[in-house]
Amino acid sequence: SPAGYQPYDSVLMLLAALEDPGLTVLPTHRVTTTPLPTYDKVRALLVDQFELQEFPFTTGTQGAVRAQFIEALRTNGRKVPMFGLALKGDSRYVTLALKPAHRPPAQASPRAKLDVSLLQQLVVATLCPTPQEQEAILYTKDDHEALDWVAKGTGTGALLLNATKVSEVQAVATAGERMPHKSTYFFPKPLTGLVM
């Protein structure tokens, strides 16, 4: 070992092939904890940039409607930038499909084209405009946990994303850019820890 080397000078790394079919990137959903406007006001703020599709529910239909909402988000989100929205005290889920006029141009940087970048710029910055509001956002990889936090009052709004594709991560890295904050959750995680 080199002179002066200490064990704390090293970092544990795991290298995996990007093409490995077992390598998955899970979405990192946002849950706001600061007060948000009513749904009508949120709709007015977002309707110019997004096509909104509402999934209203009752206590008896909430589970089935939630499943339809998540399926619509996953299926349609493969074609266009799309997000999911749920607000505390509101009995509907909403998908937000970015209108063509507001999508990044083909020559935009790979980072600018990411769903997570678009969500941050167009939705989070609109609903949580101050740094303090953005710092109070909670994160989860689980759709149902995000929606449950809002239903139970832990959060005021859930913003659901589709997962970043491994190819998108590669494109950002190849362009010499950094991924946005909380944009990837690689799975499976390597086992770490101490054995005693």
For the regions a language model picked out, list residue spans one by one.
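Surface-exposed, charge/polar-rich loops and edge strands
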Residues: 1-196
